[in-house]
């Protein structure tokens, strides 16, 4: 085994004011001043144009020097055996071999210990347990560090991936989402507060609700929260907890809200791997409703590089949206997959749409790109899909055990 393993039970006026903000921009506008500027601009009008003007003015005025670079030596990664978490762990081990990671994961249906195979022992301690277990979480900062202090430095940051995330499941039973996404986040925040640990919270663009299909607007850090379903509501609640612990307790926090990810290790219940594995398993792909809903796709590797950038260079107390300008509607994505896998463009079945399904997500990542210098590397979506298809084709033993049960669950739901 390639790591330590611990088992636990575990308009006009707006235009003039925006110009004034541009002309008076300084190199040191603090967050409170930024917030005041936002409010003055937005209060002048209820229109989306006012909000866009506020965004632009604050981006121009916000030239405050970033925090000194943060160089963590030991990170607690919650949910590190899941889809995005595992990709993050692999990426950190590959690109920052001096960093040790303690992965805390409950190994629910969507997480697998084998997702971390190949991570060097020097980089990884695996703990099987639940983030809602406050005693276990506390032991990671006391007992674990005491036992391994000679070899592993103390935990200096938490990167919090652990979450229930599948919308369909939240519609059937929201309780695991409230427990993990809200209570679990609270437990981790309290541990971080007690030990003065930096805390990066992984969230979703779904907290902002959805956008109309025919409008050019995208989500920004100033977009209002309008969650549409139980999953996004639970993530919105967790975001607010993180902000409250920063303001009330002075906890060093950052938040990232990302668009839809694709890539290796994603469970077959998700849209892209479901279509790919259906074709590989000889099942006709399934498309919710007419397939006109738009998602903003990003490679999971790009998402993980953005997280590292925010963790190490982001300003404390700030939120950063992560996206790669990858807007496609679902039917076009499915037809890309069909083409790449040598199938007819109409070789799929329409099934019942998801109740309350969101129309469109779209991320404006300007703040992350201009303030921290991050940019996506994998911008050819079709090329990324081809690589993802290759991964699932080569890892049938990884996904096949989950396939039949997942499709049966969808069949019962009419999907």
PLM regions: where:
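N-terminal Rossmann-like NAD(P)+-binding domain of SDR-like oxidoreductases, especially those catalyzing
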Residues: 2-7, 13-17, 32, 37-261, ...
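The catalytic Tyr-centered alpha-helix of NAD(P)H-dependent dehydrogenases
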Residues: 227-234, 264, 268-272, 296-300
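C-terminal substrate-binding subdomain of Rossmann-fold SDR/epimerase-dehydratase oxidoreductases
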Residues: 46-60, 68, 72-75, 88-91, ...
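Hydrophobic alpha-helix immediately C-terminal to the catalytic Tyr-X-X-X-Lys motif of short-chain
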Residues: 237, 241, 245, 275, ...
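Short histidine/acidic/glycine/proline-rich micro-motifs that form metal-
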Residues: 107, 260-263, 293-294, 354-355
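Structural element of the ATP-grasp superfamily
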Residues: 188, 242, 275, 368-369
